[in-house]
Amino acid sequence: AKEKGPCGYFDRTKYADGILPIDTYKTDVDELVAPEYNYDWETLRLSIQQHGLRHSTLSAQMPSESSSVVSNATNGIEPPRGYLSTKKSKKGPLKQIVPQYGSLKNNYTLLWDMKGNDGYIKIVAAMQKFFDQAISGNWSYNPENYENNEVPVSVMAGDFLKTYKYGWKTSYYQNTYDNKDDLLDAIDEKPNQVQDLLSEILETEEDDCDSCKI
């Protein structure tokens, strides 16, 4: 903005009034992350009021399903459903392994291994504080973690209230584990074939990977 001027209609944004994301977040999230800032937000506030912003909005966080296929990445902040998965692409079913599987396998939290949404809800809430657009968060439930394989309404209601308390702006999907593995179905559930497929993908030359060809 200092070089080329502010974006059109900048005067209609909250930024023009000197309002930053740290002024409008739900303060309950301070229970999770103390409001201690390393950046000089007050100097930034004055600079924005003086020069404007080149873009009217600065940050967003989407599930990034399509871009994750091309970039061979996981879906944004979402926990992967498995180390190996199949995704739809213009080429047809795409076999995809989580990035740096060999060195980071033990650092991944898989979606259906999670016993609840508490940690995920709090992480999204802490991020939302610094975002000027709504994060599309999801809730995921594995019935196997509950009595009679039924997710209690009280659990879902509790998650809903917790997301509101900590300042979520948008809730998107309610995912439920149905005990079906699309990848295993695709390869006829043959013993050891998942591990064989992982080995095959890991040995593939970078330029020859499925994502690179799309």
Can you annotate each of these PLM segments?
Residues A1-I214:
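Long, C-terminal-biased catalytic regions of enzyme "large/alpha" subunits
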